[in-house]
Amino acid sequence: MKTKKWGIYRIFVCIVLSVFVVLFATMGIAGEDACFYCGMKKAMFGHSWMDIERMDGSAVGVCSVHCAAIDMALHIDQPPKNIHVGDFNSKKQIDAEKAYWIIGGDKMGVMTSRAKWAFENKASADNFMKEHGGRPAIFEEVMKAAFEDMYEDTLMIQKKRNMMRMKKAQP
């Protein structure tokens, strides 16, 4: 009887420890604020970071319009309720639908060769266009452009990551 109680106690302790390990691991991952799809850190990409809240209450943070397009395609039955994006200059999260968007220009985009930048006000967007080029757009056009660019951008990302792996492998 004593052995049976000891066995139950050991199982209980293992379960409790497993729960704590999972909880702490989850908190560590969530605390990093990394893109759900590519792992890029929010601290480095606040100027393009997007927070997507879906109708079902779930939410995700992604580094760019590119990764937001991936999320929208994968969650076709869970439409977004709110989408916020980082203002290019301040990194402050703003409503993506109300943002002043610029597509293109000479500044390399995040996860894309055709940049898509959001600005909180028109003056900032106009100043950016004067300095870097591009054209004004609304959010719907930005998302359409992201889907149009997806194939080429994915090939570009795969090529860059392969080159980085090769560099790391060299002595």
Identify the residue ranges that each predicted region occupies.
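N-terminal secretory signal peptides that target proteins for export/translocation
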Residues: 1-9
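Intrinsically disordered, low-complexity terminal tails/loops enriched in metal-binding residues
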Residues: 24-171
